[in-house]
């Protein structure tokens, strides 16, 4: 099993997908994080069942994240 902070370290400056507690999905380039898993994403898009929105730079509180997946 990969530890979350190790995955974030490997994913720096790469695209990731985040599933949030409210079932939204954010996809963007990880440009920063801290020990609480708060993250900074650039070129971020929010995906819901109905639509996709471009958000740009997002600062995300770590406790809102359910899962983290690297994108190729």
Residue ranges and their predicted role:
Residues 1-72:
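Conserved RNA-binding domains used in RNP assembly and mRNA/RNA metabolism
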């Amino acid at each position: 099993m990969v530890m979350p902070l190790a995955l974030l370290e490997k994913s720096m400056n790469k695209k990731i997908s985040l599933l949030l507690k409210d079932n939204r999905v954010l996809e963007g380039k990880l440009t920063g994080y801290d020990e609480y898993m708060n993250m900074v994403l650039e070129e971020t898009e929010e995906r819901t069942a109905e639509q996709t929105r471009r958000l740009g730079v997002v600062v995300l509180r770590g406790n809102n994240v359910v899962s983290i997946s690297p994108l190729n």
